[in-house]
């Protein structure tokens, strides 16, 4: 999504796991892009290096929310949703969330995050309920969102299926052995 948008407008991606080298930032497709793509990476604050995983995430979220200077904020996963929600409130900027999974339907995360699961669930719930728009990647995901967050206005939840970069795919030749596999399982 960011590469396609960057063909038309300036896009800044704020990411976890530290700064990015210029070589790691994808090139913008097209011959004459009208925008740009910038990736800014954030590290966990030193004071939180030994903290619970959710608190580490919150530390990065606070940095991201503080730095946002945008016309619109797009977030996905609870990691980014808290940063998006905080930035929305701090900078009065519209927030759009794309849902790929939902914390209430991933209870095994309690084992991974311990009490941090309560924090991740809270962060996601608040972000969804205050988002200006929520994008579900399927009709089933839309139903799950409305089940998990019944206070969310259903009119704010729309379905937009995941996309692919068509230029990265090509139809195999007629004699490609992959067709036999396709025919067997199709």
What is the predicted function of each stretch?
Residues 73-74, 129-139:
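A short beta-strand/loop micro-motif in the catalytic core of glycosyltransferases
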Residues 75-80, 99:
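Short His-centered aromatic/hydrophobic patch
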Residues 99-102, 161-162:
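Histidine-centered beta-alpha loop that forms part of the nucleotide-sugar donor binding/catalytic region
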Residues 1-31:
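N-terminal subdomain of nucleotide-sugar transferases
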Residues 17, 140, 160-163:
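Carbohydrate-associated surface elements
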Residues 93-96, 104-126, 173-174:
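Nucleotide-sugar donor phosphate/pyrophosphate-binding loop at the beta->alpha transition
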Residues 29-68, 112:
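A short, charged, and often flexible helix/loop element on the N-terminal side
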Residues 170-186:
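A short helix/loop element that forms part of the nucleotide-sugar donor recognition site in Leloir-type
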